[in-house]
Swiss-Prot record:
It is found in: Cytoplasm; Preautophagosomal structure. One of its GO terms (biological process) is pexophagy. Pfam families: ATG7_N (PF16420), ThiF (PF00899). InterPro entries: Atg7, Atg7_N, Atg7_N_1, Atg7_N_2, ThiF/MoeB/HesA, ThiF_NAD_FAD-bd, Ubiquitin-activating_enz. Residues 615-654 are annotated as: Homodimerization. Changing residue 518 to S: No more micropexophagy. A motif (GXGXXG motif) lies at residues 332-337. This is Ubiquitin-like modifier-activating enzyme ATG7.
């Protein structure tokens, strides 16, 4: 076989689906709109290759790592990824110009001789791609830039076992030598001694140069195209007569090539190397990995996608991780609980717990989107558990549980202490285990104990309450020092839901009429209040002080804007007011007296608040405040009527 061009087998690519998943992750979290070249690395196997197979370059999720451990049967191949932002950008790229530019990178390493120390500069690859992250589709095109040099094959000879035997031990020594792996695929052979190309200057271009090449192809009598740039390099350095020992470790015959440079190199190097499709045509490939990936993982990535787009396109400072990692407790799984949980899902929250002691009724599904008609049958399914199951159907990776328990209510006497104490203990445990608590119940007194506990355990607490055409959304102020409550500066913390009241919570549910038992409210009010409550929670997390953040109407309070304490909305005139109220020193839920009493007596304190109507008012001083206000009112009336009053009572009107 004489006077012929060198027979080459082209390189084929193999892309593990994990590579595309890694691209998606990096695109969202790191690269964003940056479409500059990104360094990657692939690998080629030279031992475990099937029969009659071309060189196969593999990439996977590890291709982006700086330090990769390779087996003794692999060579690393350096490359770049150019991932474009739109499919139009991909189409507009001048493919020939791009290929030539990559060839010039190889050519430069030959000009400056850096390739002699790092042969991987001669075997580089690139990927031009576009990632459709919503559709989980990837358009990509591999290229293996090969500089063109024309060589004439004078002789191609297979190596018999006896001919290759003298080289076997040398090959094993070479592969195990303490050299960078990038140096080992090709080498100089000098009297059966293998030498790195760093020593090329010791050899004269006038003599025939013997080189060894460890082939990564198994096609009979064809060299891997990885040899192309090595031969171009030698031609550039003036070597025109070369004998190539093509060594194979894959049960196919090794062979030698005696070659001579057929044409001088052109002044402008020409580059080939775009990968062809399975049909032998030039063109990109399409990978649709949606069917290959766990659907739950696809859902996870899709949820993150919208949030990450919001972050790096609009608000880079937004801390999504703190939102995602927050554990949220929803006290109430009805209308407000349903809508709040859906907004939280949209924000990427992964841990939501429901507490409710009700069952799904036939009036619920139309207003409460976590329930459907079948949940109303057979007496109704438990709301909390059903809501948790519904969230898992919407997003399987959510951690969600429902607890069917009754929150102990101030003014509602203890009737079954064992059960109510268990409910109390469970509530305390749940509040301790979570980062934020939403009070979404439909009665005033059910909010009392959670308000106390959130202050004692320093938890973010948000209340949402509805009227017919109005709503209240507010965040509770917390103690700055829960260990030493007596040292607390009350004037510097925000108030809670009960701070505007001059009476303690009492039983408001007994003997209610039908219109009082049902939530009578315009249907849209719940959506407004729920969305504002969830958004307020997200804004709180963006403030460094979290639950201790002061109320601020300035747009720069957080990266999301202002951070109010209260939002009161009215649908009759479509207005929303931002209000602020500091802690009330006689508050029945967050005053120093109440918090100290709870810390010292816990359940016994709660029992007294449940059993005795006036206990909280006496404890906090509200009883005295009411008495004093009644005396003051009486004295003012007497004054207005022109009646005399004693000097000792004058303090009430001065």
């Amino acid at each position: 076989m004489t006077s012929m061009d060198i027979p080459y087998s082209q390189i084929s690519s193999f892309v593990n689906s994990s590579f595309f998943q890694k691209v998606s992750q990096l695109k969202l979290n790191k690269y964003r709109l940056d479409d500059t070249d990104k360094a990657i690395v692939g690998s080629v196997d030279f031992k475990f290759i099937g029969k009659n197979q071309p060189t196969s370059l593999s990439v996977d999720e590890s291709s982006f790592n700086d330090n990769i451990t390779y087996t003794h049967a692999q060579f690393p191949v350096k490359g770049i990824l150019k991932n474009l932002n739109t499919v139009e950008d991909f189409r507009k790229v001048d493919k020939n110009e791009f290929l030539q530019s990559q060839g010039l990178v190889v050519h430069k390493s030959i000009q400056d001789r850096s390739c002699l120390k790092d042969l991987s500069k001669l075997t580089q690859f690139f990927i031009l791609s576009f990632s459709d992250l919503k559709g989980f589709k990837f358009i990509y095109w591999f290229g293996f830039p090969s500089l063109v040099s024309r060589w004439k094959v004078n002789k191609l000879s297979g190596l018999t076992e006896s001919q290759i035997e003298p080289y076997e031990s040398k090959l094993n020594e070479w592969l195990n030598a303490r050299l960078p792996i990038e140096q080992k695929q090709a080498f100089i052979i000098d009297n059966l001694e293998f030498k790195p190309f760093e020593q090329l200057s010791s050899f004269s271009p006038d003599d025939q140069l013997n080189i060894g090449f460890i082939d990564t192809s198994s096609i009979l009598n064809k060299c891997s195209t990885q040899l192309r740039n090595i031969l171009y390099m030698l031609a550039y350095y003036g070597f025109e007569n070369i004998k190539v020992y093509n060594f194979r470790f894959n049960n196919t015959t090794s062979f030698t090539l005696d070659i001579t440079l057929a044409e001088p190199l052109t002044s402008e190097p020409k580059t080939t190397g775009w990968e062809r499709t399975a049909q032998g045509k030039l063109g990109p490939k399409l990978a649709d990995i949606g069917a290959l990936v766990d659907p739950a993982r696809l859902a996870d990535q899709s949820v993150d996608l919208n949030l990450k787009l919001m972050k790096w396109r609009v608000m880079p400072e937004l801390d999504l991780d703190i939102i995602k990692n927050s554990k949220v407790l929803l006290l109430g799984a009805g209308t407000l609980g349903s809508y709040v949980s859906r907004v939280l899902l949209g924000y990427g929250v992964r841990h939501i717990t429901f507490v409710d002691n009700g069952k799904v009724s036939f009036s619920n599904p139309v207003r409460q989107p976590l329930f459907n008609f079948t949940d109303c049958l057979e007496g109704g399914a438990p709301k909390a558990e059903t809501a948790a199951k519904a969230l898992k159907l919407i997003f399987p990776l959510i951690t969600s549980q429902g607890y069917n328990l009754e929150v102990p209510m101030a003014g509602h006497p203890v009737t079954d202490e064992k059960r109510q104490y268990e409910d109390y203990q469970r509530l305390v445990t749940l509040i301790k285990e979570h980062d934020v608590v939403f009070l979404l119940m439909d009665s005033r007194e059910t909010r009392w104990l959670p308000t106390v506990l959130c202050n004692v355990f320093d938890k973010i607490c948000i209340t949402a309450a509805l009227g017919f055409d109005s709503y209240l959304v507010m965040r509770h102020g917390n103690l700055f020092n829960t260990e030493h409550i007596e040292a607390e500066e009350n004037s510097h913390r925000l108030g809670c839901y009960f701070c505007n009241d001059i009476i303690a919570p009492k039983d408001s549910t007994t003997d209610r009429t039908l219109d009082q038992m049902c939530t009578v409210t315009r249907p849209g009010v719940a959506l407004l209040a729920s969305s504002l409550a969830a958004e307020l929670f997200v804004s709180i997390l963006q403030h460094p002080l979290k639950s201790h953040a002061p109320a601020s109407l300035h747009d720069n309070a957080t990266v999301l804007g202002c951070l109010p304490q209260q939002l009161r909305g009215f649908l009759h005139n479509f207005e929303t007011s931002k209000l602020e109220a500091n802690n009330y020193e006689y508050c029945s839920a967050c005053s120093i007296q109440v918090l100290n009493e709870y810390k010292s007596r816990t359940w016994d304190f709660v029992k007294d608040a449940l059993n005795e109507n006036n206990y909280l008012e006496d404890l906090t001083g509200l009883t005295k405040v009411k008495q004093e206000s009644e005396i003051a009112e009486k004295k003012f009336q007497e004054f207005e009527n022109g009646l005399e009053f004693s000097d000792e009572d004058s303090e009430w009107i001065n």
